[in-house]
Amino acid sequence: GTASFVDANTMKVVKNDGEIMNVTGTSILLTIGTRPYRPPHIPFDGEAVLDSDEILEIKELPRSMIVVGAGVIGIEYATIFSALDTQVTVVEPRETMLEFIDKEIVEDFAYQLRDRNMKLIFGQKAEKVERDESGKCLVSLGNGRVLKAETVLFAAGRVGATDTLNLSACGLEADSRGRLKVDPETFQTSVPNIYAAGDIIGFPSLASTSMEQGLSLIHI
């Protein structure tokens, strides 16, 4: 089912069978996670222009793919498809990838990826994504260059899945990416009895750290 706030201590739960119930507690922990960021100027179609959830549903292995975003998810999928002999090009507006990892490790990793014939384009933003008459995907970069591939995977970030929680009812407000700010020691939000952990609080947004955050909250 789904849940949303009634007040700081109460949540309305709508079960899959339509039954509605209110659940009350002295403390509430939010670990609702994130979903792919889908900016309006990207023409997602579930067929050739895909987000990181939709890519799991493809029916055929593309011959070529442009991955927009060189974060953890983008690079994970880029290496997977490259290993399956898809010609992969990664586009990233920043000057490097995986910025939170040691620079020397990233440089060596980038060398290995290029050695496997993966193209890495750093310092260029994907300004426009469209499909031509043949169905191929075209990605226009900030420098005027146009890339062509069978598939585009847009993996430039994720947003907190907080829009259905009715946060205003409990006094919370998410940032522009749907994330919640917490005390880094206690994971307490601005509302004293409400806590949040995992991807919903932002960096580093890794499964391992999210698990540790959840475990630490059990003992608070």
Language-model regions: role of each:
Residues G1-G25, L120, K128-C137:
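Feature captures the FAD/FMN-dependent oxidoreductase FAD-binding
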Residues L30-T31, V67, F154-A155:
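Redox-cofactor binding/interface segments in oxidoreductases and associated redox assembly factors
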Residues G1-T2, D7, I32, D51-D53, ...:
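Short loop/edge segments at beta-strand edges and connector loops
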Residues S4, T34-R35, G157-G160:
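Short glycine-rich anion-binding loops that position phosphate/pyrophosphate groups of nucleotides
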Residues G18-S27, G144-T151:
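Core beta-strand elements of the Rossmann-like FAD/NAD(P) dinucleotide-binding domain
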Residues G46, L56-E57, P62-I66, V72-N143, ...:
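Rossmann-like dinucleotide-binding cores of NAD(P)H-dependent redox enzymes
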Residues D45-P62, V146-L215:
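FAD-site-proximal beta/loop scaffold in flavoenzymes
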Residues I218-I220:
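Conserved small/polar residues in nucleotide/adenosyl-binding loops
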